[in-house]
Amino acid sequence: MLGVFSSAIVSPPEELVAAGSRTPSPKTTSTALVDRFLQTNSSAVSVQVGDNVTLAYTHQNESPLRQRSFAVKDEIFCLFEGALDNLGSLRQQYGLAKSANEVILVIEAYKALRDRAPYPPNHVVGHLSGYFAFIVYDKSTSTLFVASDQFGKVPLYWGITADGHVAFADDADLLKGACGKSLASFPQGCFFSTAVGGLRSFENPKNKITAVPAAEEEIWGATFKVEGPAVLAATE
């Protein structure tokens, strides 16, 4: 799956900008990135949302345990990969039909967060049990919400293209060609929200997240880590 967002929607994370500046490397534009995804995945589907957002996915080379799905409801777009262990109980909690799958559930959970503000954003993902990565884009508010499960069982990466777009994908090689060293693995147990202004841990929302510069031989430009209480105490 692939989500590409212009700087009008999300400001490129400073840590990824810095990583690309430390070790200059070839990049391509967001348009070239989307084109490459569509060309290398014959069954791919892409959706253009206005001038600033492109979402794409494919069932090609899909793991039976990590199926990809896409849905749109009430101008909320969602790409989901993985499976939820507690889908049944969550359907009841949100009053959904038994036919509702994970991607519909995530849209409803996000909508509950948006409409019940100030509802803590970490609650959207904190009660999801299983392995997952998802990208939510709310067209009505131009809000982006991205999350990865606490164990990082579903791969998710993010980077910055040559034209300053922020891209998320489950394929590191795809992003490497477009983002160079402005690339990192999306940290497990975390969510990124333009509504709250950045990256947070949904297990420990008050804990600081730092970006550690990666060695030159690594594919990444940086590694994001959630600091624990002991680490925070030592740095205060």
Name the predicted role of every residue range.
Residues 1-236:
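Cysteine-centered catalytic environments shared across enzyme families
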